[in-house]
């Protein structure tokens, strides 16, 4: 009985450490999101402006430039966040175990955050073309759907923070594939329509 009780308390302590580590890491993670979102909003704005005046070749250039900008920004900021992670995490906690846990989370989220930027840019471009419904559904399926499947079917067999947070880049990759396919067909349809009207 005492053994079970101490084991239960140990599990609670581990969960508290994991939650504190995630909370601290998520604060750093938020700064990266602001950068990615700024590039996505720029992509959407410039795409919609060019779409409005029928400059469809410029829309491709906008997306390519934004993909490059997002990639470069996230490689610099994401890797810097991980490199300076131990120091940055001390802003939020002094517990060494929480910092270690936060670093595990940062490894799978900040270093690969350029994937999240790519995932957001294709829907941003599609919204600029007046198509928002399908990209929204694909984003929900790709991110939320993948993580739900991951938590219920993969995580129970390999219960560790590493396996749990690999679901982030995995869901981003799946969503990117879905969004690129959607972008290809929408672009093809819109460009055919624009050529017919020209």
What are these regions (language model features)?
Residues 145-155:
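Transmembrane alpha-helical segments of integral membrane proteins
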Residues 11-30, 97-103, 131, 166:
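Interfacial/gating helices of multi-pass transporter permease domains
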Residues 6-7, 44, 128, 150, ...:
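Tryptophan-centric aromatic hotspots in well-structured domains and transmembrane helices
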Residues 47-112, 154-198:
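Short alpha-helical transmembrane segments in multi-pass integral membrane proteins
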Residues 26-29, 73, 141-146, 171-175:
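Transmembrane alpha-helical core residues of multi-pass small-molecule transporters
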Residues 109, 139-140:
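Short, contiguous acidic/charged loop-to-helix segments that flank catalytic cores in large enzymes
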Residues 21-79, 83-85, 116-138:
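Small-residue-rich hydrophobic transmembrane alpha-helices
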Residues 1-13:
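Single conserved hydrophobic/aromatic residue that forms the stacking wall/gate
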């Amino acid at each position: 009985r005492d053994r079970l009780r101490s084991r239960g308390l140990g599990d609670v302590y581990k969960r508290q450490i994991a939650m504190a580590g995630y909370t601290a890491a998520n604060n750093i993670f938020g700064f990266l999101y602001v950068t990615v979102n700024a590039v996505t909003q720029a992509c959407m704005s410039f795409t919609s402006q060019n779409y409005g005046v029928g400059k469809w070749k410029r829309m491709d250039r906008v997306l390519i430039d934004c993909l490059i900008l997002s990639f470069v920004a996230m490689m610099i900021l994401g890797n810097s966040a991980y490199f300076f992670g131990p120091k940055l995490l001390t802003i939020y906690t002094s517990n060494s175990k929480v910092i270690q846990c936060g670093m595990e989370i940062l490894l799978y989220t900040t270093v690969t955050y350029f994937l999240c930027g790519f995932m957001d840019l294709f829907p941003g471009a599609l919204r600029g073309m007046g198509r928002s419904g399908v990209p929204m559904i694909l984003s929900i399926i790709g991110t939320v759907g993948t993580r739900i499947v991951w938590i219920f079917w993969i995580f129970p067999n390999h219960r560790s923070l590493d396996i749990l947070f690999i679901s982030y880049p995995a869901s981003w990759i799946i969503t990117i594939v879905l969004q690129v396919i959607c972008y290809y067909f929408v672009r093809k349809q819109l460009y055919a329509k624009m050529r017919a009207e020209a």
